[in-house]
Structure formats: C-alpha cells, structure tokens
Amino acid sequence: MKRIKLFTAALLLAAMSAGNDMWALSTSGKKDTHPVESPKFFSGNANPLSDFIFVADPTSMEYNGRLYVYGTNDTQQLDSVGKDGKNTYQYIHSLVMLSTDDMVNWTYHGLIDVKALSPWGIASWAPSIVSRIESDGKTHFYLYYSNSGAGVGVLTSTSPVGPWTDPLGRMLVSQFTQGLGHCKAPFDPGAVIDDEGIGWLSFGGGGKGEVGTDYMPGDARIVRLGKDLISLDSEIVEIKAPYHFEANELNYWNGTWIYTYNTDWNKRTEWPHEGVDKPSICCMSYMTSHTPLDTDSWKYVDNYFKNPGDYGMGFSNNHTHLQKYKGDYYLFYHNMCCLLYTSPSPRDI
C-alpha cells in the first residue's frame, strides 16, 4: 500500500470573540444566531476553520460536491465554566456543523442539540459520520458520537445538516455491552462503510486498568455493524494498539482497513517493533488489516502526525480525520493555538 505523506497548513493566531449567545442551539441550524458565512483571516489559508466558535474532534464526509465537517462544541464548555474554569468537557452537549466547497470559505450550519434529542445522555463529543443511499432513494446520514466516556450514541438524518433524530433512545455501545471485555471507556467512535456496503465501528479508551500494560493497554475495539447501521452484528474484537489512548478512526481503501488513534502520555519503555520508530508522546499513529475481526491481523505501521506541542504549539490531546476531497487528501486535526490564555483550554480545528 502506498503511504501518503500528510502536510498541514500552519495555523494562524487570531483574536476570537464569544458573545453570551455563542451556542444558541438548533437541531437544524436555522435558529442559531451565528453568521452563516465565517469571516476569514488575511492569509486565505482558512485555519482554523471557524474564528467565532471553538471546535474539536473533527470528522467529515462529502455530499453532492460539498465537504461537511462536524466537531465537538468546546465553546459550550467555555461559556459554562468561564475563562478561569477547566475543560472537563462535562458541559458539552452539542456538536458543530460546517461545510465548504473550496477548503477556504466555510459556511456555519449551526449546532446539533444532542441533549434535546437524547435526554438520556451525559455529554456529546467526538462525532464520526457515514452516509449511504437507501431503498427510498434518499441519502441517509449516521452520526456516531461519544456519550461522555460511557459509550457511543448515534443520530440519523436524511440531510447532512439535519434535522436529526435519535433512532435508539439509548447508547449503541455502553460499558455494559456484552463481549466488551476490558474497555473502561467505550467512546470516541470511528465509523466506515466498506466497498461491500458493510459498516464498521471502532471505539475505546480508558487506560490499562488492572489487566493491561503501558505498552498494550488493551482498550481499543472494533465491531461490525448490522445492516441498519444502528446495531451490532459481530463479536467485539480487540485491536492491539500500542500505547493506545483515544481518538479512534477507521478508513477503508482498496481492501485495507486503516485504524488511527491517539497514543498516550506514557514513556515508551517497551517497543518490540524492529525497523519501526517508537511513536512520540500523544501523537497520531495508524494500523492496517485485511481481516478486521482477526485480532492478530492488525499491524502497527507508523506514527504519522506528531502532537502540536512538537511543532511549538501547546501540548494537548489530538484527534484527526483523513478526508479525500476533489482529488486531494486533507488531514483535519485540533489544537489549542487560539485558547486566548484561558484555563479551560478550548480547542480549534
């Protein structure tokens, strides 16, 4: 498999403002008070994507020639705790919707009020979206998200910007799901549909607990989804991901499943992979498989994106999404470049 080297544009530092109505909620995007068009920085690089709301944990998909990006609404936490509070993510109950047709000019489509749609939930972070054309001739969208660290929820729509509905009224995956094994935090979903139309879901985190090691925490998982994409259709299998932390993502290219994840902060004291460099601290690494439900088929390949702190920005967790759009590959990620010296440490895509 050809390896793709990823390059990202340098982020610009800029002042950002947040009014009292910064996160007025809307499931359709039509009632939100933010401007439809995002003002742009002088360079034209359009980084970060939004300059009026903090967004993290990106996912994206193309629909009718337009690229839609979804993320965690960090501004909701900032507005809840103030500039001297902490970003525990506990007050985040909504997801942000953006789109573009040129990767420079971005349109803001409002927020998905997950708390209103799924009142049983705890918090909503880190979405992952897939879509397909179904028997009614419509394109259906499936948006998986973290219900805090407790599990994975799912929302559906026939439009990329809603309105959204909760088809289950509960978590798709939880800490009590049968066959989960040692996975304290079955969150941070990464979904993909393969060439056969089969859906797959990766998730997991929470650390080694009593049975794992620093090198192999044993908390990364993958499962095949049912034909309805809102049920599970296989046993839950461990992906043996070295120094696994969170930020799970799945891609599928030419018969190969590609699993990416954020490594943890532990020292790399153990590393049995000859000829492959140890992953740096809290970086993004990836693994590949041709038979994803075979635990031993997953092979560690490389550390493909270091922590923003390694490039002179603030150290933080990371979360990436690789997207092919109009013939080019783009890597979405977040950092704390525009945190404005606030304690909550909000993030930007």
Predicted regions and their residues:
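Bacterial N-terminal signal peptides
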Residues: 9-17
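Blade-edge beta-strand/turn elements of extracellular beta-propeller
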Residues: 34-51, 106-117, 159-182, 224-243, ...
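Beta-rich catalytic cores
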Residues: 55-56, 123-125, 185-188, 244-246, ...
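Hydrophobic core segments of beta-strands in well-ordered, beta-rich domains
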Residues: 58-83, 109-112, 125-148, 153-155, ...
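Beta-propeller domains
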Residues: 71-106
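Short, solvent-exposed loop/turn segments at conserved positions within beta-propeller repeat blades
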Residues: 88-93, 148-150, 211-218, 277-282
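Beta-propeller blade signature
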Residues: 95-100, 154-158, 219-225, 283-291, ...
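Single conserved hydrophobic/aromatic residue that forms the stacking wall/gate
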Residues: 341-349
